[in-house]
């Protein structure tokens, strides 16, 4: 009967019925769908519609449906205004009465002016929990975790976005990401509509955790463009704290180990299960999750109410078997891969560009004098700038600079002005930490030397090293009270800021600690291996097992990951470790090379017996030499284009970094001899500008001419500057997709015009403007052997285009010019047309996607009548029409050397196509005219089926 009444009301204007009658007719519908009675009672009390006695009567009802019926009885008995207010509460508190949204929409309820003035209090558990989460995340993300615990930096004042790049499944560049909001939107960079995980990856220290902290801060303050009502943040390394016997329900994981609802947790969890799309999860550092727990022994799916091991819950959350539809943002270091079916987007963090670095310097040093002093020192040392491209290292260097300013107030604080290694940076920050408790006023200035500082802090450093080594050995990054006590760390040591305390996360109570960054743990691990006299040479070198030869199985890794492909949607646990990233081992090796370098011996002799130091140094060098020979010999080689090409892998970059840390010319010469090729391919290795310092250190000893391919990396202008020692021997220089600006091109111009040996210059997809185009033109003018020039997808307009075209016209060696994806327009096209006339060498020209109209097309067609060298011209994605087609048809009746004419995605119709087809009757040289994507209908294209050289579809 009541159900019939409900349907009877559908589509009937509310004004025709009283509010009391509406509640009567829909009584059972309301009884069924109202879950939260307390919120109704609270609002009726707040506005004086219910007395305390009314509230007690409702509370005395034994079941929720009985409570709803009693509220309805009381509301209806109090008249129209109270009934209308009752409906107003249902309308305003959408989360509390989500099941009534459709019904409220159907009845077209609109409150009167009187009712709109009434106060609505939201005591709904779901809404309260959202506010609780916002408060907690806002508090947790307010301060940037600083390397000295006594200092807190406001995140709002120190955070800066880094270069964020959308990439495809195979890490191909899809363009830059506009900002953090774009991470979660549904229109930018989506690879898989069914995927739920946004995967953010990048090298250690590039800012992944800071990005998540900023995301939390924005969500907590309501500034994030997201509909998420719940935000759960987990650090993957914390899951390593759980024992194999630990069992948790999903509700316990979310509430007891993150944030427990202040009221009605069952109601909150029920809402989350019903509407998982209202939740956003962030999982930080998947590569830092290591456990012996075997997920292959447990079912693929699990029930949200049944207890399971926390790693099972994590795996099923990531795979979507739990809370399917919830948004997930996952971070990991470069090298970790996630199954495609889970991915929604992939975002690569690139670190600071030169402009980011200068902006960050201004933010960290608002005082003008200090700011200018710092920037002058950075400009004088590209090597230091390259290190600062990694936000973590930049922050450490800047904080050390600030410390020197404070300690030596009134004097000029100075950053190193020579080659700086990562070991130098971490020794510096160690010295700063240890000197924090020392007097720093002008009256009591601390004058201890670095050696004295380290000697005074020997006990602390050794204890920290013991903690770090124990964790690194097991790939663990969180330490309990027992590990800290076993190393004899004292309370004062913990206050120095190397270790920071964490909130309780495991099932057992007790304080946990972590180093402020993985790289610091690696540094102290290396320090322990060098300084502890009980460490054997075998143990000293054990992390070098990560230096596997290309093609070797990864089973020799120091520690295998707990994760299997099965848990994330793959088929088998067997085979290579899907999470091969072992940067903590690689950084340990790097710091070992740095600490045992000749330059550090005087410092370390204060701490380590001379004989032990000599023995360890000898063992490291012997192993380093043997590893280098073996690895370089095993690199894949191929004969291509007249070159003996060697394709280096990312491990080769780690070797270069270790060699650079030694600052040993002997090791550099050995590595250079081992290359044994004249073409070194380092494309897609995620090399950064600092790696160019290491590469130059080795190639400086390579005395033959060399082709160098560094396409698709992250070098920027600082990287180009660091390559300066190499340019005297580089004949092929491929620097495409590297964030290079006009500043970097200027360096190239200055260097390449000195030696004039370059034959190939690749600068595709950078940030070069007309200014840089002029430098490129100068290179082409002065380097008479330059044959291949790739300048596509930059920011070059007609002015820059004319400069390049003039240089092409004057060149007798150039054979291939790529200008795709610029904006040279008709003026630029006319300049290239002039260059084409009677050109002696040019065979391939791409002017695709350049805004060229029929006017520019006509000039090019006319010029080709006077050209006998060009065989390929690409004019794809311009604005050419039938008039242009007619001009090219006339050209084809004269030109008998052109082989490929690409006019794809222009505005040519069947009429223009017919003219081109007729011209082919008098041209036997051309092999194809590509017209795909023009204004030609399929039925019109059939006319040209017999002419195989016309390609319409």
Curated annotation (Swiss-Prot):
GO biological process: apoptotic process; cellular response to muramyl dipeptide; defense response to bacterium; defense response to Gram-negative bacterium; defense response to Gram-positive bacterium; detection of bacterium; ERK1 and ERK2 cascade; innate immune response
LRR repeat ranges, renumbered to this chain: 702-725, 727-750, 755-778, 783-806, 839-862, 867-890, 895-918, 923-946
Predominant location: membrane
Domain spans labelled CARD: 15-107
This protein's UniProt keywords: Apoptosis, ATP-binding, Cell membrane, Cytoplasm, Immunity, Innate immunity, Leucine-rich repeat, Lipoprotein, Membrane, Nucleotide-binding, Palmitate, Repeat, Ubl conjugation
InterPro entries reported for this sequence: CARD, DEATH-like_dom_sf, Leu-rich_rpt, LRR_dom_sf, NACHT_NTPase, NLR, NLRP_HD2, NOD1/2_WH
Disruption phenotype: No visible phenotype in absence of infection. Mice however show impaired cytokine secretion in response to bacterial infection: macrophages do not secrete cytokines in response to synthetic gamma-D-glutamyl-meso-diaminopimelic acid (iE-DAP) and do not prime the lipopolysaccharide response. Deletion mutant mice show a normal glucose tolerance but the level of circulating insulin after glucose infusion was significantly lower than in wild-type mice. Mice lacking Nod1 and Nod2 are protected from high-fat diet-induced inflammation, lipid accumulation, and peripheral insulin intolerance.
Gene Ontology terms for molecular function: ATP binding; CARD domain binding; identical protein binding; pattern recognition receptor activity; peptidoglycan binding; protein homodimerization activity; protein-containing complex binding; ubiquitin binding
Lipidated residue numbers (S-palmitoyl cysteine): 558, 567, 952
GO cellular component terms attached to this protein's record: apical plasma membrane; basolateral plasma membrane; cytoplasm; cytosol; phagocytic vesicle
Topological type in the membrane: Lipid-anchor
Tissue: Although ubiquitously expressed, NOD1 levels are more abundant in immune cells, the gastrointestinal tract, and adipose tissue.
Post-translational modification: Ubiquitinated. 'Lys-48'-linked polyubiquitination by RNF34 promotes proteasomal degradation and thereby negatively regulates NOD1 for instance in NF-kappa-B activation. Palmitoylated. Palmitoylation is required for proper recruitment to the bacterial entry site and hence for proper signaling upon cognate peptidoglycan detection.
Positions with a binding annotation for ATP: 202-209
UniProt subcellular location: Cell membrane; Apical cell membrane; Basolateral cell membrane; Cytoplasm
Keyword NADP appears in the UniProt entry: no
Keyword Transferase: no
Record domain NACHT: where: 196-531
Pfam family, one: NOD2_WH
Entry similarity comment: Belongs to the NOD1-NOD2 family.
Oligomeric and partner information: Homooligomer: homooligomerizes following ligand-binding, promoting RIPK2 recruitment. Interacts (via CARD domain) with RIPK2 (via CARD domain). Following RIPK2 recruitment, RIPK2 homooligomerizes via its CARD domain and forms long filaments named RIPosomes. Interacts (via CARD domain) with ubiquitin; inhibiting interaction with RIPK2. Interacts with ARHGEF2. Interacts with NLRP10 and recruits it to the cell membrane following invasive bacterial infection. Interacts with IFIH1; this interaction promotes transcription of antiviral genes and inhibition of viral replication.
Function: Pattern recognition receptor (PRR) that detects bacterial peptidoglycan fragments and other danger signals and thus participates in both innate and adaptive immune responses. Specifically recognizes and binds gamma-D-glutamyl-meso-diaminopimelic acid (iE-DAP), a dipeptide present in peptidoglycan of Gram-negative bacteria. Preferentially binds iE-DAP in tetrapeptide-containing muropeptides (MurNAc-TetraDAP or TetraDAP). Ligand binding triggers oligomerization that facilitates the binding and subsequent activation of the proximal adapter receptor-interacting RIPK2.
Protein name stated in the entry: Nucleotide-binding oligomerization domain-containing protein 1
